[in-house]
From Swiss-Prot:
One of its GO terms (biological process) is negative regulation of cell division. ATP binds at K50, G51, G52, V53, G54, K55, T56, T57. It comes from the Eukaryota. One of its GO terms (cellular component) is cytoplasmic side of plasma membrane. It is found in: Plastid, Chloroplast. Disulfide bonds: none annotated. InterPro entries: CobQ/CobB/MinD/ParA_Nub-bd_dom, MinD, MinD_FleN, P-loop_NTPase, ParA/MinD_ATPase. Transmembrane segments: none annotated. Keywords: ATP-binding, Cell cycle, Cell division, Chloroplast, Nucleotide-binding, Plastid, Septation. Gene3D superfamilies: P-loop containing nucleotide triphosphate hydrolases (3.40.50.300). This is Putative septum site-determining protein MinD. Belongs to the ParA family. MinD subfamily. GO terms for molecular function: ATP binding; ATP hydrolysis activity.
Length: 306
């Protein structure tokens, strides 16, 4: 028996904010550009505060899932100097140029975009490999995102650096929406709460929550906070909950997101469902706090046809 509950209507709200300009072969990084250009692009920053909670894994899998739904998607790896998004997508050997090269006029923006061979409507853009994060300003990020919107990307997902320093502030500056990734551990929840406050302080109020590495066995023993408890503590609309899955390690080493596996694991199903809710195609959650033993396996059987 499966349990579902209706997603709140307000979780799909969006705040319109201005984007910035794009030049022909390089990104215009002038400080004078105040052009207010409307765009249909959704600009979403994926953040966590605490490192190691699965933020980059979530970005890769949700981004890939959205692309599989038919939308044009670009993932920006803004974790400067510690990039890993290319590894999770299996694109590490194809990066020739980065955004820093575009800023410096060494290449065009389209040359720095790496298109996924499996899904042509998914692209990756790395900010840099070895430069300090402080070299990328808010204006740089805003102009970059406007340039990508002008290339008709429907979804622009920014994989934000961990922490709450200057790199975080610069990375979130062009975003309209935010997705906070956390686990049920107390330190991660505390950091997520602080990040939510910083996002609101910087004008981002459309915030959603993704709870990662959920273990039903620990929840039933009261050794882990439930999904509902975490959501209530943070007071942020819930996008989804991802069960613990050992296949994440295998997926990372192979450079293949979980959502591309022929036989989806429970976490792969959960990532796909979260992506569908993000684009407004699914209104219901699977209740991972169900007291019935084996609910995860029942969900898996339902989607895998067993």
């Amino acid at each position: 028996m499966l349990f579902f509950f209706k997603a709140p209507k307000f979780m799909y709200g969006s705040i319109k904010r201005k984007n910035l300009c794009f030049a022909t072969s390089t990104i215009d990084i002038s400080e004078e550009d105040n052009t207010d250009t409307k765009t249909s692009s959704r600009i979403i920053v994926v953040t966590s505060g605490k490192g190691g909670v699965g933020k980059t894994t979530a970005t890769a899998n949700i981004g890939m899932s959205i692309a599989r739904l038919g939308y044009k998607v670009v993932l920006i790896d803004a974790d400067i100097g510690l990039r890993n998004l290319d590894l999770l997508l299996g694109l590490e050997n194809r990066i020739l140029y980065t955004v820093m090269d575009v800023f410096e006029g060494q290449c065009r923006l389209d040359q720095a975009l790496i298109r996924d061979k499996r899904w042509k409507n998914l692209s990756l853009l790395s900010i840099s490999k070895n430069r300090q994060r402080y070299n990328v300003t808010r204006k740089n990020m805003q102009n970059l995102v406007k340039a990508l919107a002008n290339l008709n990307f429907r979804y622009i997902l920014i994989d934000c650096p961990a922490g709450i320093d200057v790199g975080f502030i610069n990375a979130i500056s062009p975003a309209q929406e935010a997705l906070i990734v956390t686990t049920s551990e107390i330190p991660a929840i505390r950091d997520a709460d602080r990040v939510a406050g910083l996002l609101e302080a910087n004008g981002i109020f459309d915030i959603k929550l993704l709870i990662n590495r959920v273990r039903s066995d620990l929840i039933q023993k009261n050794d882990m906070m439930s999904v509902r408890d975490v959501q209530e503590v943070l007071g942020v609309p819930l996008l989804g909950a991802i069960p613990e899955d050992n296949q994440v390690i295998v997926s990372t080493n192979r450079g293949e997101p979980l959502v591309l596996k022929k036989k989806l694991t429970l976490s792969g199903i959960a990532f796909e469902n979260a992506a569908r809710r993000l684009v407004g195609k699914q209104d219901y959650f699977v209740d991972l706090d169900s007291p019935y033993k084996g609910v995860f396996q029942k969900i898996f059987d339902l989607f895998s046809g067993n």
